[in-house]
């Protein structure tokens, strides 16, 4: 079936088959990335722009490496050093990028829906690299890729616990939408004010405490607290108190299955949602996630370029 769309805006709109297509395509690029020479010329003569209106380490660097390994010309755009500071709108910025015959725009923006807005107003393909609290599809795809790599099945036999600031996490939303397509059992746990008001749409179990959240899990995804998106509506306890009730430590990880894996989209707040003895321990596959991000994003960029003809 493949993936035949111009843009990649979220996992909620993807079919199970389309998700599997990306995961299968990523295998080729994972193998390439393990070689001494990591480049190919699939995107030779193509131009990608990483348009980031928010700070990023892993996602922007990963997309840049992905594009360059595919042979594309890559430009990094940051809002703080652009005409955005002079009042230029997102619409005008996208139009100008398209006028320069850009093939793909990788967009990160603080406003939910920004990627869809941009995609409707440019001929370039748009990849949503995170729009507000809405979605972050490439992160969800690399998370699923990592699950498969560690022998976790994408079906009802796998239990995934997502713990932390779910209400403000675009990663959580994309992960949940993608996992639900496969019938994966998803459990959620967070402080009450960090559970989404519309959590029932996820059709997931909401746990009462960390012990219940970790019990019998195959995968635990930890999320940081996103105070920058809180708008003053979160009464944040001390880091020590948060860690006591909502942090993952070496005792709580023992409640999960013996071969459970721990994921985190980063950045990690050590000693808050995740203790170092877990982040650096045998259950952690966090750096493997980062590695897999390059392969998955290569698959995304290559697919969208092929769709452009």
Swiss-Prot record:
Pathway(s) of this molecule: Pyrimidine metabolism; UMP biosynthesis via de novo pathway; (S)-dihydroorotate from bicarbonate: step 2/3
Binding site for L-aspartate: 86, 170, 224
EC number: 2.1.3.2
GO molecular function: amino acid binding; aspartate carbamoyltransferase activity
Cystine crosslinks: none
Assembly: Heterododecamer (2C3:3R2) of six catalytic PyrB chains organized as two trimers (C3), and six regulatory PyrI chains organized as three dimers (R2).
GO BP, sorted A to Z: 'de novo' pyrimidine nucleobase biosynthetic process; 'de novo' UMP biosynthetic process; amino acid metabolic process
GO cellular component: a single term: cytosol
Key words of the record: Pyrimidine biosynthesis, Transferase
UniProt entry tagged with the keyword Ribonucleoprotein: no
Protein's job: Catalyzes the condensation of carbamoyl phosphate and aspartate to form carbamoyl aspartate and inorganic phosphate, the committed step in the de novo pyrimidine nucleotide biosynthesis pathway.
Protein name in UniProt: Aspartate carbamoyltransferase catalytic subunit
Enzyme class: transferase
HAMAP family: Asp_carb_tr (MF_00001)
Annotated gene: pyrB
Superkingdom in the source lineage: Bacteria
Reaction catalysed by this enzyme: carbamoyl phosphate + L-aspartate = N-carbamoyl-L-aspartate + phosphate + H(+)
Species whose genome carries this gene: Campylobacter curvus (strain 525.92)
Binding, carbamoyl phosphate: 58-59, 108, 136, 139, 266-267
Family listed: Belongs to the aspartate/ornithine carbamoyltransferase superfamily. ATCase family.
Gene3D superfamilies per UniProt: Aspartate/ornithine carbamoyltransferase
């Amino acid at each position: 079936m493949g993936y035949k769309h111009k843009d990649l805006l979220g996992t909620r709109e993807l079919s199970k088959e389309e998700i599997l297509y990306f995961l299968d395509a990523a295998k080729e690029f994972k193998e390439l990335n393990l070689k001494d020479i990591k480049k190919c010329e699939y995107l030779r003569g193509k131009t990608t722009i990483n348009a980031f209106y928010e700070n990023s380490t892993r996602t922007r660097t990963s997309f840049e490496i992905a594009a360059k390994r595919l042979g594309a010309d890559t430009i990094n755009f940051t809002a703080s050093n652009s005409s955005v500071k002079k009042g230029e709108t997102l619409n005008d910025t996208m139009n100008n990028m398209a006028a320069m015959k850009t093939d793909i725009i990788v967009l990160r923006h603080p406003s939910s829906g920004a990627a869809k807005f941009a995609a409707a107003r440019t001929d370039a393909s748009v990849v949503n690299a995170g729009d507000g609290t809405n979605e972050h599809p490439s992160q969800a795809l690399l998370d699923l890729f990592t699950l498969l790599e560690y022998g976790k099945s994408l079906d009802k036999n796998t239990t995934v616990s997502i713990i932390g600031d779910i209400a403000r996490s675009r990663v959580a939303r994309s992960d949940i939408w993608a996992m639900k397509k496969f019938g994966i059992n998803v459990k959620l746990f967070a402080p009450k004010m960090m559970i989404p008001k519309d959590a029932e749409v996820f059709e997931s179990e909401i746990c009462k405490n960390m012990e219940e959240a970790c019990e019998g899990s195959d995968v635990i995804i930890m999320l940081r607290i996103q105070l920058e998106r809180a708008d003053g509506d979160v009464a944040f306890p001390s880091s020590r108190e948060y860690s006591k009730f909502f942090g993952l430590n070496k005792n709580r990880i023992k409640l999960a299955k013996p071969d459970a894996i721990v994921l985190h989209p980063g950045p990690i707040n050590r000693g808050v949602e995740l203790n170092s003895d877990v982040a650096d321990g045998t259950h952690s596959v966090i750096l493997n996630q980062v590695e897999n991000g390059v392969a998955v994003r290569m698959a995304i960029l290559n697919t969208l370029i092929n769709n452009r003809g």
